Design a protein with these regions (language model features):
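N-terminal Rossmann NAD(P)H-binding glycine-rich loop of SDR-like oxidoreductase domains
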Residues: 2-25
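NAD(P)H-binding glycine-rich loop region in Rossmannoid oxidoreductase-like domains
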Residues: 29, 36-98, 102-103
Length: 134
C-alpha cells in the first residue's frame, strides 16, 4: 500500500516511518523541511513532497500525484503540546480531512484510508497544568 505520511520529521512520524516500512508499505513523506529527514530515512522513502500540512490543495495533489492508497497524519502533534498555537492543530486536521475527501472524490469516490493521531489532544501535557482539550 502506498501511504502519504504527514509529519514524518516529528516525534510520532519519525517512529511511524520504520513501522510502515517494516510492513512493506511504500511511504511518501509530506514535510515542510525535507532537510530534517535523516539520510537513513530518506533512503527508505518512495518520495518526498514539500508542503504545509494545513494546505488542502497540496495534500490533495500529493495524494493524487503519488497515487496514495492511505494517509497517516502525525502532523500537528506539536500544536497540541503548546509548542505552537492550538489554531494550527485544528487547521492541519481540517486540511487533511478535506484534502483526502477531495482526492477520493476526484478519483471517482474510491475511499482513501486515513489515520489521525488525534487522540493525543486529550492527553495531559507536562507543558501545561491542564488537559489540552478541557
Amino acid at each position: 500500500m502506498k501511504v502519504l505520511l504527514l509529519g514524518v520529521t516529528g516525534n510520532v512520524g519519525s517512529r511511524m516511518l520504520p513501522a510502515l516500512i517494516a510492513h512493506e508499505h511504500q511511504v511518501v513523506a509530506f514535510v515542510r523541511t525535507p532537510a530534517k529527514i535523516s539520510p537513513e530515512a530518506t533512503s527508505k522513502l518512495d518520495s518526498i513532497v514539500v508542503g504545509s500540512a494545513s494546505d488542502i490543495a497540496a495534500i490533495k495533489a500529493a495524494i493524487l500525484s503519488h497515487n496514495c492508497d492511505a494517509v497517516v497524519n502525525a502532523a500537528g502533534v506539536a500544536a497540541m503540546t503548546g509548542l505552537t498555537s492550538q489554531g494550527e492543530f485544528a487547521a492541519i486536521f481540517a486540511a487533511v480531512v478535506q484534502g483526502t475527501l477531495e482526492a477520493g472524490q476526484e478519483r471517482g469516490g474510491a475511499p482513501i484510508r486515513c489515520w489521525f493521531m488525534s487522540g493525543f489532544g486529550i492527553l495531559d501535557s507536562p507543558k501545561k497544568p491542564y488537559l489540552l482539550l478541557d
